[in-house]
């Protein structure tokens, strides 16, 4: 279990790399963050396109990404830091989000005082930081990109047409979008990102609002069908 024994996971990766000549490692979830933070346990010649620990820290958390997006002028929903339930000023509905969490865990839609009261205990149950983000009605989508130390190599945007677990996209429709390309390129250049980067957005009319960042590759099949082979680009 990588969550319970992260160092053991890193050591096992190192052992596998010494035994077999792997051409590439392709992180598809939070193991990308772990590999960036645990490089001391891994071979120096790690076959992976991966950003540094400091770069991950600017994007991996929901709060850090919101701060970085504000700094760059990227469009996001209104958001606030949460000290306690009484400190929230946003109008209903909004999303209460732990700094680190997924759509199925530590993310709650708050539409009333009753909703907030039901999750208030979670705000003090741990040292986790929280934020609230205004709910926006629109089409959920993602823009995926690959960077080589800040240089954009490939990009693909899509919107959800079918829902999966936790509201994720089980089916996607590729779209042409100059704006999402410009936005993700601006972010990648600023961070000097290396590897895959994915931004989640809500499309409302012709505007895109970025709600969080996945500093990794997400499902690549739709992009492949649209002519963008992210795994191949990462390997090469």
Q: Model regions: which residues?
A:
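Short glycine-/acidic-enriched loop or helix-start segments at secondary-structure transitions
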Residues: 35-38, 105-107, 142, 222
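ATP-dependent carboxylate activation and anion-phosphoryl transfer catalytic cores
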Residues: 20, 176-236
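Phosphate-binding site of ATP-dependent enzymes
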Residues: 111-191, 202-210
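Glycine-rich phosphate/pyrophosphate-binding beta-alpha loops
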Residues: 104, 161-166, 170-172, 214-227
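Glycine-rich, highly charged phosphate/nucleotide-binding loops
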Residues: 1-15
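Active-site regions of enzymes building and remodeling cell-envelope glycoconjugates
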Residues: 1-3, 45-48, 95
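A short, GP-enriched loop/loop-strand-helix hinge that lies immediately N-terminal to
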Residues: 19-60, 73-80
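Active-site nucleotide/adenylate-binding loops and adjacent lid/helix of ATP-dependent enzymes
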Residues: 55-137, 147-151, 178-181
């Amino acid at each position: 279990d990588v969550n319970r024994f992260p160092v053991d996971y890193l050591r096992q990766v190192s052992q596998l790399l010494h035994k077999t000549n792997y051409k590439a490692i392709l992180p598809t979830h939070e193991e990308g963050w772990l590999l960036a933070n645990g490089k001391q346990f891994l071979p120096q010649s790690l076959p992976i396109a991966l950003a540094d620990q400091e770069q991950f820290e600017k994007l991996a958390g929901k709060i850090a990404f919101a701060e970085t997006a504000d700094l760059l002028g990227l469009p996001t929903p209104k958001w606030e830091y949460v000290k306690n339930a009484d400190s929230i000023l946003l109008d209903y509905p909004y999303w209460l989000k732990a700094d680190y969490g997924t759509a199925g865990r530590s993310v709650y839609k708050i539409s009333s005082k009753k909703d907030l009261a039901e999750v208030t205990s979670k705000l003090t149950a741990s040292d986790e930081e929280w934020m609230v983000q205004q709910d926006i009605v629109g089409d959920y989508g993602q823009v995926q990109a690959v960077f080589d130390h800040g240089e954009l190599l490939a990009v693909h945007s899509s919107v959800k047409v079918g829902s999966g677990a936790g509201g994720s996209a089980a089916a996607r429709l590729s779209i042409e979008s100059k704006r999402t390309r410009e936005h993700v390129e601006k972010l990648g250049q600023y961070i000097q990102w290396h590897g895959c980067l994915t931004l989640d957005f809500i499309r409302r009319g012709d505007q895109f609002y970025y709600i969080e960042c996945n500093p990794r590759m997400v499902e690549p099949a739709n992009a492949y069908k649209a002519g963008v082979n992210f795994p191949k680009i990462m390997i090469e």
